[in-house]
C-alpha cells in the first residue's frame, strides 16, 4: 500500500488553508482523540449480536470517522517527523516479547496476567 499520494493530499489540503499554524502535537493529539471517540460512538450501547447490522447500516459514517482518524494520525506523524513504518516495526518487536505466542495465542489477557 503506497500512502504517498494520500499523505501528499493531506499536506496540500492543510497548506492550502494555512492550517499548519494550528496543527501542533497537542492539538493534533486532541483532535485524534475526539475522532476516535466519535468512532466509538457508532458502536455505543450495541450488543455483540447487533454489531453486524450496525456496521452495515452505518458503514459510510464509520468509514468517515476512520478517515478522520487516519488524517489526523498521518498529519501528526508528519509534524513529529516520525518514521511510521519503523515505529510500527519497533513496537511489534516490543510486543512480541511481551506477548509470546505460547502464552498469548487465543488469550485476551494483558501481558502482566499471562
Enumerate the language-model features and the residues they cover:
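Flexible "arm" and connector segments at domain edges
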Residues: 1-66, 70-114
Amino acid at each position: 500500500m503506497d500512502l504517498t499520494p494520500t499523505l501528499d493530499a493531506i499536506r496540500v489540503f492543510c497548506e492550502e488553508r494555512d492550517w499548519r499554524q494550528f496543527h501542533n502535537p497537542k492539538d493534533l493529539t486532541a483532535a485524534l482523540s475526539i475522532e476516535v471517540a466519535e468512532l466509538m460512538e457508532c458502536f455505543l450501547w450495541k450488543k455483540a449480536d447487533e454489531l453486524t447490522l450496525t456496521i452495515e447500516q452505518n458503514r459510510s459514517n464509520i468509514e468517515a470517522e476512520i478517515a478522520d482518524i487516519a488524517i489526523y494520525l498521518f498529519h501528526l506523524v508528519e509534524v513529529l517527523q516520525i518514521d511510521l513504518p519503523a515505529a510500527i516495526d519497533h513496537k511489534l518487536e516490543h510486543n512480541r516479547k511481551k506477548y509470546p505466542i505460547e502464552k498469548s495465542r487465543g488469550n485476551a489477557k494483558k501481558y502482566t496476567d499471562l
